C-alpha cells in the first residue's frame, strides 16, 4: 500500500475480511472517535445535566448517542466510495462560493474557530485535575504542560500511534466509570430502572434545556467528530483498500465488504461511548441531584468527584482524578489529532495550501499540532470558566449539525451510491435527521423563550 493513504490506486487494493473475528482486526477509527466523544465534555456536561435534571433528561443522552450514528455511517460510506474527506465533499455541496471556498467549507472553519473555546475548557479542566494531583505546579503551569504534551504526541501525525493511545485511554476510563456505577447499588444513592422511567420528562425548564442542548451537541457523535471520522476511515485504509471506482462487480463487492467493516467499527464505538456517557449521566443524577449539588466554576472538580467517592469510597478520590485526567485528556488528544487534518484540508480548499501533497500536508499538520493546543490554553487562561466554555462549544456543535445533516442528505440522494439503500437504512437515517433537527430547533426556541442560557 502507498505510504499516503489519501492516494488511491490499483496497488492499494485489498480484499475485505469476511469473518467476524477477522473484521475485528481492521477496527480502529471508532476507537479514536470514542476517545474524543467520551472525553469531550461528558465528564462535565453530561454529569452537570444529570445533576440539574435528575433522571428527567436521561432520554436526551440516549437519543444523542444513538440518533447521530446513521448520519455518521452515511459520511463514512461516502468517503469509502469516493475517497473524499468530509471537507472535500463539502466543497461539492450546492451553494455559493465565498472567494475560492464553498460556503460550507467556510462554515466549518468559523465553527471550529468558535469551538476553540470548548476545547480550551476541556484542556483547562485537565490542568485543574493535574493541579489537584500535583499541587506543587500551578494551574497555569499544568495548562501549558498539557498543551505541550498533546502537541508532542500528535505533531508527527502517525495514525497507528493515535489509534493505540486512544484505545488505551478509553479502556482505562471505561472500566473506572462502569465500576463506579455498579457499586452505587451498595450506597444510599442506589436506583432502579423504574426511577428512570417514572421520572422521565419531555417538558424541561429553560435552564435545564440550555444545558441539555449543549450536552446534545457534545455527547454522542458531535458534528466535528462526524467530519473527523472520514479522515480516520481514510487513514485506516478503508478507501484505499477499495481501490479506484470502476463499477465492476468485483469493485462493488469489495466496496460493500469494507463498508461492512466500517459499519461494525461504528457500532462498536457507539456501544462504548453510549455505555460510558449514560453512566456519567446516571452518576450525576443519582448522586449530585440527590444531594442538591450542581457543579459550578469554583468547585467543579470537587463536586464531580462525588460521583466516584460516594460509590467507591473516599479513597477513590485519587482514582477519580486519574480517571478524570484520562477522560478529559483523551478528548484534547483525539480532537487535536482530528483538527490537524481538518484545518489543513480547509486551507487547501480555500487555495492556501495543497492537502494532496503529502510533504506539504505533514508540515502543516506539524505546525497546527503546536498552534492549536496553545490557542486552547490561551482561551482557558483568559476565560477561566471551563463549564461555560464546554457547554458553549456544544451549542456551536448543535448548529453545525444542521449543515452535517444537509450534507448527509446530499450524499444519500445526489451523490454516488453503491446500490439503493434498504428501507431499514433509510428509516434509520431519517430518524437520525429528524431527531437532530427536532432537538436542535426545540432547544433554540425554549432557550430564547426563557432567556436563560446557563
Task: Give the ranges of each region predicted by the language model.
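Juxtamembrane transmembrane-helix boundary signature
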Residues: 33, 60-95, 107-114, 334
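Hydrophobic alpha-helical segments and their helix-loop junctions in multi-pass secondary transporters
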Residues: 171-207, 212-231, 405-417, 439-451
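Flexible loop linkers connecting adjacent transmembrane helices
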Residues: 6-11, 46-48, 73-99, 130, ...
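Extracellular/periplasmic helix-exit of transmembrane alpha-helices
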Residues: 70-81, 233-234, 240-241, 271-302
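C-terminal membrane-solvent junction of multi-pass transporters and transport-like membrane proteins
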Residues: 168, 351, 355-367, 391-444
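Membrane-interface "cap" regions at the ends of multi-pass membrane proteins
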Residues: 1-42, 102, 214, 238-243, ...
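Hydrophobic transmembrane alpha-helices that form the core helical bundles
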Residues: 101-134, 328-348, 392, 437
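Loop-to-transmembrane helix boundary motifs in multi-pass membrane proteins
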Residues: 100, 139-145, 315, 347-382
Amino acid at each position: 500500500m502507498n505510504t499516503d493513504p489519501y492516494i488511491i490506486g490499483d496497488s492499494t487494493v485489498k480484499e475485505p475480511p469476511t469473518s467476524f473475528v477477522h473484521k475485528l482486526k481492521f477496527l480502529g477509527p471508532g476507537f479514536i472517535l470514542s476517545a474524543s466523544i467520551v472525553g469531550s465534555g461528558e465528564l462535565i456536561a453530561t454529569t452537570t445535566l444529570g445533576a440539574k435534571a435528575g433522571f428527567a433528561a436521561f432520554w436526551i443522552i440516549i437519543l444523542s448517542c444513538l440518533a447521530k450514528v446513521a448520519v455518521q455511517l452515511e459520511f463514512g460510506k461516502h468517503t469509502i466510495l469516493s475517497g473524499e474527506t468530509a471537507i472535500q465533499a463539502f466543497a461539492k455541496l450546492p451553494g455559493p462560493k465565498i472567494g475560492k471556498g464553498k460556503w460550507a467549507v467556510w462554515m466549518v472553519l468559523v465553527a471550529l474557530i468558535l469551538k476553540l473555546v470548548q476545547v480550551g475548557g476541556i484542556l483547562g479542566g485537565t490542568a485543574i485535575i493535574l493541579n489537584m494531583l500535583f499541587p506543587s505546579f500551578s494551574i497555569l503551569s499544568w495548562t501549558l504542560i498539557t498543551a505541550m504534551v498533546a502537541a508532542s504526541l500528535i505533531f508527527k501525525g502517525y495514525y497507528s500511534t493515535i489509534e493505540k493511545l486512544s484505545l488505551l485511554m478509553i479502556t482505562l476510563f471505561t472500566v473506572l466509570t462502569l465500576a463506579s456505577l455498579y457499586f452505587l447499588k451498595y450506597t444510599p444513592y442506589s436506583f432502579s430502572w423504574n426511577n428512570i422511567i417514572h421520572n422521565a420528562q419531555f417538558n424541561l425548564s429553560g435552564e435545564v434545556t440550555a444545558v441539555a442542548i449543549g450536552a446534545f451537541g457534545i455527547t454522542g457523535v458531535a458534528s466535528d467528530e462526524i467530519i473527523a471520522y472520514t479522515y480516520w476511515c481514510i487513514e485506516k485504509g478503508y478507501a484505499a483498500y477499495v481501490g479506484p471506482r470502476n463499477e465492476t462487480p468485483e469493485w462493488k463487492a469489495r466496496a460493500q465488504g469494507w463498508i461492512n467493516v466500517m459499519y461494525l467499527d461504528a457500532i462498536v464505538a457507539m456501544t462504548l461511548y453510549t455505555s460510558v456517557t449514560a453512566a456519567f449521566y446516571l452518576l450525576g443524577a443519582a448522586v449530585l441531584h440527590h444531594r442538591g449539588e450542581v457543579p459550578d466554576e469554583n468547585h467543579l472538580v470537587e463536586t464531580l468527584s462525588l460521583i466516584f467517592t460516594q460509590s467507591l469510597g473516599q479513597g477513590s478520590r485519587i482514582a477519580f482524578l486519574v480517571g478524570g485526567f484520562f477522560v478529559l485528556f483523551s478528548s484534547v488528544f483525539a480532537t487535536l489529532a482530528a483538527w490537524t487534518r481538518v484545518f489543513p484540508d480547509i486551507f487547501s480548499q480555500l487555495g492556501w495550501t495543497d492537502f494532496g501533497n503529502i510533504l506539504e500536508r505533514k508540515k502543516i499538520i506539524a505546525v497546527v499540532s503546536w498552534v492549536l493546543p496553545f490557542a486552547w490554553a490561551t482561551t482557558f487562561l483568559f476565560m477561566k470558566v471551563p463549564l461555560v466554555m464546554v457547554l458553549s462549544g456544544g451549542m456551536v456543535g448543535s448548529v453545525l449539525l444542521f449543515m452535517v445533516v444537509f450534507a448527509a442528505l446530499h450524499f444519500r440522494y445526489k451523490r454516488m451510491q453503491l446500490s439503493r439503500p434498504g428501507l431499514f437504512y433509510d428509516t434509520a437515517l431519517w430518524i437520525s435527521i429528524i431527531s437532530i433537527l427536532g432537538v436542535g430547533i426545540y432547544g433554540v426556541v425554549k432557550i430564547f423563550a426563557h432567556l436563560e442560557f446557563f
